[in-house]
UniProtKB/Swiss-Prot annotation:
Catalytic activity from the UniProt record: ATP + H2O = ADP + phosphate + H(+)
Taxonomic lineage from the root: Eukaryota, Metazoa, Chordata, Craniata, Vertebrata
This enzyme's EC code(s): 3.6.4.-
Compartments, record wording: Cytoplasm; Endoplasmic reticulum; Nucleus, Nucleolus
Family designation: Belongs to the arsA ATPase family.
Record organism: Xenopus tropicalis (Western clawed frog)
A single GO molecular function term of this UniProt record: metal ion binding
Keyword set, alphabetical order: ATP-binding, Cytoplasm, Endoplasmic reticulum, Hydrolase, Metal-binding, Nucleotide-binding, Nucleus, Transport, Zinc
Protein name according to UniProt: ATPase GET3
Record note on quaternary structure: Homodimer. Component of the Golgi to ER traffic (GET) complex, which is composed of GET1/WRB, CAMLG/GET2 and GET3/TRC40. Within the complex, CAMLG and GET1 form a heterotetramer which is stabilized by phosphatidylinositol binding and which binds to the GET3 homodimer.
Length: 342
């Protein structure tokens, strides 16, 4: 007689936990796009800059892009960056740039349009067209960045993303752009009288409606190519950064579910700012914090047993400047060893 079903699992081996580092990401040479994101204030920028540093040691050329309007990578490396890729001091193959995708037609100053009623009407019509698809101006900004970056042939691009909502729009930008361009193509004849003046004002030269439509259509193949790459786990992955607190854990779960809907690969989580009490220096607050964090860490390890979960410590100092980022980056590859317990 067959053994009871429960007995079948008694001798089943425990699932080995995955390595608690980002070595799998560093070693995956096929990756071209790596996104680092999560809730605000969890240390995404420090982690993304550290990841870029480690990648620069094994790849020919690495670009880190900040899509967060706060532009913290300038603070992290203690070096001013712009919307043009700039070499990070101390590195030969690591570049950084900062963009603000939220700037679009709606952000153009009204003073430019005040002297010409035709231009003023044109701006309003373009804004109306953009509003038909929320996020199209932001998505077009992403599209232009992707077009430029693809032409630069970096080995891998790391995105230091804005908080979760912006990040999801970034990942969905190919769909938004396709819909938005379709809408703009439908109304191109309506806005034709204004296009030439608008293009001259924006420094795009003399251009009629058909020429503009042609340029927009040229963008679509790049958008579709990037969209396909984003959904290819061999080329794209997303690293979630969080802290061991309820709200951050909740946000991480929501983010992972949304990534799954977008068919974006994710199998790495960084739990940052962990407190490890020192036996020689008793601290009631540290002990209490450690207890709370341990509870959520246990939940994460149960919930994400098929993820690489890297655990990084809360440091007594800011991680700022290339040297400090370089030191911190080693924690991505070597599990942190807290002070020995009592």
């Amino acid at each position: 007689m067959a053994a009871p079903a429960d007995d079948e699992f008694e001798d089943a081996p425990d699932v080995e936990p995955l390595e608690p580092t980002l070595s799998n990401v560093i070693d995956q040479r096929s990756l071209r796009w790596i996104f680092v994101g999560g809730k605000g204030g969890v240390g995404k920028t420090t982690c993304s800059c550290s990841l870029a540093v480690q990648l620069s040691r094994v790849r020919e050329s690495v670009l880190i892009i900040s899509t967060d309007p706060a532009h913290n990578i300038s603070d992290a490396f203690d070096q001013k960056f712009s919307k043009v890729p700039t070499k990070v001091r101390g590195y030969d193959n690591l570049f950084a740039m900062e963009i603000d995708p939220s700037l679009g037609v709606a952000e153009l100053p009204d003073e430019i349009f005040e002297e010409d009623n035709m231009l003023s009407m044109g701006k309003k019509m373009m804004q109306e067209a953009m509003s038909a698809f929320p996020g199209i101006d932001e998505a077009m900004s992403y599209a232009e960045v992707m077009r430029l970056v693809k032409g630069m042939n970096f080995s891998v691009v790391v995105f230091d993303t804005a908080p979760t909502g912006h990040t999801l729009r970034l990942l969905n930008f190919p769909t938004i752009v396709e819909r938005g361009l379709g809408r703009l193509m439908q109304i191109k004849n309506q806005i034709s009288p204004f296009i030439s003046q608008m293009c001259n004002m924006l420094g795009l030269g003399d251009m009629n409606a058909d020429q503009l439509a042609s340029k927009l259509e040229e963008t679509l193949p790049v958008i579709r190519s990037v969209s396909e790459q984003f959904k290819d786990p061999e080329q794209t992955t997303f690293i979630c950064v969080c802290i061991a607190e309820f709200l951050s854990l909740y946000e991480t779960e929501r983010l992972i579910q949304e990534l799954a809907k977008c068919s974006i690969d994710t199998h790495n989580i960084i739990v940052n700012q962990l407190v490890f009490p020192e036996p020689e220096k008793p601290c009631r607050m540290c002990e209490a914090r450690h207890k709370i964090q341990s509870k959520y860490l246990d939940q994460m390890e149960d919930l994400y047993e098929d993820f690489h979960i890297a655990k990084l410590p809360l440091l007594p100092h800011e991680v700022r400047g290339a040297e400090n980022v370089n030191t911190f980056s080693k924690l991505l590859l070597e599990p942190y060893k807290p002070p020995s317990g009592k």
